[in-house]
C-alpha cells in the first residue's frame, strides 16, 4: 500500500479541513508556547518530549490528523512521523500558529 505524503495546508484550507473532515487538531508545541494561545479544539502533544512517538500510538490511525506548531518546522516532522507510523490522513499547517494568528484566524487565548 502506498504511503500518502503529508499535505501542507494554508490557514484557509486548514480551517475547511478542520470543519469538514472533523479532524483531530494536534498542537505539537511546548507547554510554554501553548500558554500564549491555541487553535480552538486542539490537543497538545509536545513533539520535543521523548515520549512523543509513544503518545501518538494512542491516536486513531484512520482519523484525519491536522498538525501544527509555531512556524511549521516541528509540525512537518511530526506529520512525517505519523505517516511512518501508519496514519493515513495527515495534514500540517504551513507557517504554523504564528501565520494562523497573524492572518486573523481565531485563537483561544
Language model regions located:
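Rhodanese-like catalytic fold shared by cysteine-dependent sulfurtransferases
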Residues: 1-23, 31-64, 73-109
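Short, surface-exposed ligand- or partner-binding patches at beta-edge/loop junctions that are enriched
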Residues: 68
Amino acid at each position: 500500500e502506498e504511503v500518502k505524503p503529508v499535505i501542507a495546508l494554508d490557514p484557509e484550507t486548514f480551517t475547511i479541513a478542520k470543519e469538514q473532515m472533523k479532524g483531530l487538531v494536534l498542537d505539537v508545541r511546548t507547554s510554554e508556547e501553548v500558554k500564549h494561545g491555541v487553535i480552538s479544539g486542539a490537543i497538545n502533544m509536545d513533539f520535543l518530549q521523548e515520549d512523543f512517538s509513544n503518545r501518538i500510538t494512542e491516536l486513531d490511525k484512520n482519523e484525519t490528523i491536522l498538525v501544527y506548531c509555531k512556524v511549521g518546522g516541528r509540525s512537518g516532522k511530526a506529520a512525517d512521523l505519523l505517516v511512518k507510523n501508519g496514519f493515513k490522513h495527515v495534514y500540517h499547517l504551513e507557517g504554523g500558529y504564528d501565520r494562523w494568528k497573524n492572518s486573523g484566524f481565531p485563537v483561544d487565548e
